[in-house]
Amino acid sequence: MSAAANPSTATNSASATSALATVAPTGRGSSSTAAALIDPALERALADVVAKEAALLDDGRFDDWLTLYADDGRYWVPLQGAAQVDPIAHNSLAFEDRLLLTLRVERLKNPRAHSQQPRSRCQHVLQRSALVEAADRDGLGHELRTPFLYVESRDGEQVLLTGCYRHWLVEVDGTWKIRLKRVDLLDADRPLPAIQLFI
């Protein structure tokens, strides 16, 4: 996992970065009226994407996992957890576009990768996903939140992380794609061990 936001990422998509910089930690609909507007069928469809993503990662099917991301998709792990608003003005544990994600996948597949001898394995345990709001109000897509436990194991040692996923999903040619996956770790501000795979 990269130790800070990669400078090249910031120049790849100015519009996406501008939108991401406005992503603030907010709660699900603040009224019963907002909750009533949530479409259960839409919520299930989006939750299925999140569950599929976790299953592909657990199975080590990284190429298939990449196809779940939109062309301008991002993977973001804030250094400050849920309190962090901006991925550019403040360092992040990871802030990666499709190109950087693809490079990481290629490294994991490389039989000469020293950090993968023996290979890392992972397990995602998800709670029920919840659609935050019925409408796509910020242009990023529909936001879904999913509390999680993540276990990564390698050579007899395990790492346990917990937190909440925030996925923004958009419909592309009739298929739901991940525009942004934000991983808010519960203890993001403490020293973390090296994570080889994707949380």
Predicted regions and their residues:
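Short beta-strand edge/turn micro-motifs at domain boundaries
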Residues: 1-3, 139-145, 162-194
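Short, low-complexity N-terminal intrinsically disordered segments enriched in polar/charged residues
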Residues: 2-12, 16-71
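Short solvent-exposed loop/turn micro-motifs enriched in small/polar/acidic residues
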Residues: 47-48, 122-124, 160-162
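Short helix-to-loop capping/linker segments positioned immediately adjacent to catalytic or ligand/cofactor-binding
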Residues: 53-55, 112-119, 155-156
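A solvent-exposed, acidic/Ser-Thr-rich amphipathic alpha-helical stretch
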Residues: 71-144
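Flexible, surface-exposed loop regions and adjacent strand-edge segments
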Residues: 84, 197-199
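Short, cysteine-centered beta-strand-loop-beta hairpins and adjacent loop/turn segments enriched
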Residues: 150-160
